[in-house]
Amino acid sequence: PDRHWYGNLPEILLEKRGGGVDAMIKKIDQAARTYPYSDSYTIWPGPNSNTFIAWISRAVPELQLDLPPTAIGKDYLNPWFFSRAPSGSGYQFSLFGLLGILVSPIEGFELNFLGLTFGFDLDPLAIKLPVIGRKNFSPPASSLYALD
């Protein structure tokens, strides 16, 4: 990560290594080249930088990226109303990023209202709230196996 964004420390959302990474890089490059809003930017409700990352993630489902609930613009699907979830593991309905619903094994259940995300996730158990983001109540199941 590079620098603070509105006083917040940057965080790494995803890191991939090993076999298949070169193929993912090619798919990411292709998705970036076909991004339909490269000449457009609107802070709210999108398209914006979060819309771009969600576009890439949908095009490369192997990333299984779970964007944070604070990523306003991730739900902007215009002109489409129905799409895969950004993680590629579920589905999403959205009216111009202003009103929508997302259901996915990776992202959980999310309601989007005026670009703000409300929801919950089961692995790890968490609640998702606007401004606050994600509040985990338990560690991911995958990390429990690391304790053995």
Describe the function of each predicted region.
Residues 1-45, 58-60, 83-148:
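Non-catalytic ligand/cofactor/substrate-binding and regulatory segments of enzyme domains
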Residues 48-49, 72-74, 98-100:
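Solvent-exposed loop/turn segments at secondary-structure junctions
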